């Protein structure tokens, strides 16, 4: 029997391995598109000319009249300006199954009177029409930088801070866009400016060179449509040797942004490991968590098999990245989120109100995280030499810290109401009532309210599920206000104990409906 069970335990990981394993056969190349990339030739030496070309590349990448492949090529041209040998940069990181990069040089000819003296050429010939297309008059539909709205002069910044700092400010912002462009496009602007703030405070990005919201959205749309551009940026992070002692300031800043890009889109997977498994609480022994634990073990093996590109499987759109979605291990994820909202206040803002949330496991996670005994790791007791007296005192302190806090956090996001019912008892045990009573919908509403009051404001999970069907989203704000008012009245009534029974029976029955409806909108 033990051998049979071990076979089932390893089936998930072995199944994933067999799916991802190559079946052999010939490798048939796919169709590749040609993308033009422009690099600076040795005759372009003036810093003002270089910065002008950089902003020209940025402007073309935002031109909605151009094809997305062309716009992506201009962003590649801009990123390549960070290196003394753009050709080597593209050769090292630009090998891609989707595109073939064709490199053109931009040279400066003092004898030319048009296009500011610039000419596009290769080793064999000059491209006059391409030059006019690249450097001809262009109308920006919106400002590239916020400083342009304030009539700030980038040339002044160039004189004060120098060309490398100004170019670095532009390129770093392109990298910051990648953090949210693929995995959270709806929150792109907010996420961009949140990440940018650290670089503004340390002076990396000057105010006059901060992208406008329209610029951020434009770059993000190109990144979402041009996977080859994203692959180039990921390869840049993978191949960049961080052990070098001669990293430029721009390369260091790219690595800092890279820390945000790594594991983008894998937050649920990482948080499940952190709060669900690494906390090593006794709840992991539950049989209904066993399948999800096996699934998580399989996903860990898959993740590690990807090597240095594993943190980027979501933004690279690796075929296996969908397997890491929390809907594939809902019970364990729900339990982990329950632990997380108790142990980490910041996680209370994390969106947990999803369709696959297992409410009982979510509440169980909160319950075990609040339990003083569960907070003590037996694995470290012997290693740290903790005495029995010290453990008892620690339990005493933990009990005092959590004493009186009976509130359970509701799921956030979706249709959930982000309020907690103070001192609400949560029943996680199976109920022995009839189906009608288990749903909290007995025939006599007065009896129901009396039972609820007598059990410390008891609300069942089954009642919450039943009420969810009868609660509209439009009622949310009104329900929140009434809950706050009723809870205040309830605390006042609890303070005046030993009241006559008649007063308790006279409580407005709407209070029960408010609390129960709140449970239906997000669960308690």
Swiss-Prot record:
Annotated residues for binding of RNA: 180, 190, 195, 260, 350, 354, 356
Region of interest: Interaction with the phosphoprotein: 462-471
Subcellular location, principal: virion
Bias kind Basic and acidic residues: ranges: 487-508
Annotated spans, Ntail: 405-524
Region annotation (Ncore) ranges: 1-404
Region (Homomultimerization): 440-461
One Pfam family, short name: Paramyxo_ncap
Keyword Zinc among UniProt keywords: no
Subunit structure: Homomultimer; forms the nucleocapsid. Binds to the viral genomic RNA. N0 interacts with the phosphoprotein (via N-terminus); this interaction allows P to chaperon N0 to avoid N polymerization before encapsidation. Interacts as N-RNA template with the phosphoprotein (via C-terminus); this interaction positions the polymerase on the template.
Full protein name: Nucleoprotein
Organism for this UniProt entry: Sendai virus (strain Ohita) (SeV)
Lineage summary: Viruses, Riboviria, Orthornavirae, Negarnaviricota, Haploviricotina
């Amino acid at each position: 029997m033990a051998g049979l069970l071990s076979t089932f335990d390893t089936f998930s990981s072995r199944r994933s391995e067999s799916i991802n394993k190559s079946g052999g056969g010939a490798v048939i190349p796919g169709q590749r598109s040609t993308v033009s990339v422009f690099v600076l030739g040795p005759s372009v030496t003036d810093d003002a000319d270089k910065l002008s070309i950089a902003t020209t590349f940025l402007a073309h990448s935002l031109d909605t009249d151009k094809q997305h492949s062309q716009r992506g090529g201009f962003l590649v041209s801009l990123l390549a300006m960070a290196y003394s040998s753009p050709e080597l940069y593209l050769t090292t990181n630009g090998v891609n199954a989707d595109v073939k990069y064709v490199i053109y040089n931009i040279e400066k000819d003092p004898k030319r009177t048009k296009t500011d003296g610039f000419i596009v050429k290769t080793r064999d010939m000059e491209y006059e029409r391409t030059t006019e297309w690249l450097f001809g008059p262009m109308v920006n539909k919106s400002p590239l930088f916020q400083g342009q709205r304030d009539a700030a002069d980038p040339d002044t910044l160039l004189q004060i801070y120098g060309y490398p700092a100004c170019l670095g400010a532009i390129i770093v912002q392109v990298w910051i866009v990648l953090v949210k462009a693929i995995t959270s496009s709806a929150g792109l602007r907010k996420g961009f400016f949140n990440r940018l703030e650290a670089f503004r405070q340390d002076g990396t990005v000057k105010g006059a060179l901060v992208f406008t919201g329209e610029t951020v959205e434009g770059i993000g749309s190109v990144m979402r449509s041009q996977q080859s551009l994203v692959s180039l940026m990921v390869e840049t992070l993978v191949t960049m040797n961080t052990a070098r002692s001669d990293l430029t300031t721009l390369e260091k800043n790219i690595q800092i942004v890279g820390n945000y890009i790594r594991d983008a889109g894998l937050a649920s997977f990482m948080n499940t490991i952190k709060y669900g498994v690494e906390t090593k609480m006794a709840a992991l022994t539950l049989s209904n968590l066993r399948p999800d634990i096996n699934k998580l073990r399989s996903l860990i093996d898959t993740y590690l098999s990807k090597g240095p590109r594993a943190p980027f499987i979501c933004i690279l759109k690796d075929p296996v990245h969908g397997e890491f979605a929390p809907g594939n291990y809902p019970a364990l994820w729900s339990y982990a989120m329950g632990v997380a909202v108790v142990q980490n206040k910041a996680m209370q803002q994390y969106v947990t109100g999803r369709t696959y949330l297992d409410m009982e496991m979510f509440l169980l996670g909160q319950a075990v995280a609040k339990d003083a005994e569960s907070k003590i790791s037996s694995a470290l007791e012997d290693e740290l030499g903790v005495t029995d007296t010290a453990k008892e005192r620690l339990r005493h302190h933990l009990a005092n810290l959590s004493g009186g806090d009976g509130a359970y956090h509701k799921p956030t996001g979706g249709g959930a109401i982000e309020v907690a019912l103070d001192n609400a008892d949560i029943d996680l045990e199976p109920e022995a009532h009839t189906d009608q009573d288990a749903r909290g919908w007995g025939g006599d509403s007065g009896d129901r309210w009396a039972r609820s009051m007598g059990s410390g404001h008891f609300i069942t999970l089954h009642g919450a599920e039943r009420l969810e069907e009868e609660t509209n989203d439009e009622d949310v704000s009104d329900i929140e206000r009434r809950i706050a008012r009723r809870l205040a009245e309830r605390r006042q009534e609890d303070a005046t104990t030993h009241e006559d029974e008649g007063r308790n029976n006279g409580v407005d029955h709407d209070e029960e409906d408010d609390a129960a409806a709140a449970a239906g909108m997000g669960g308690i």
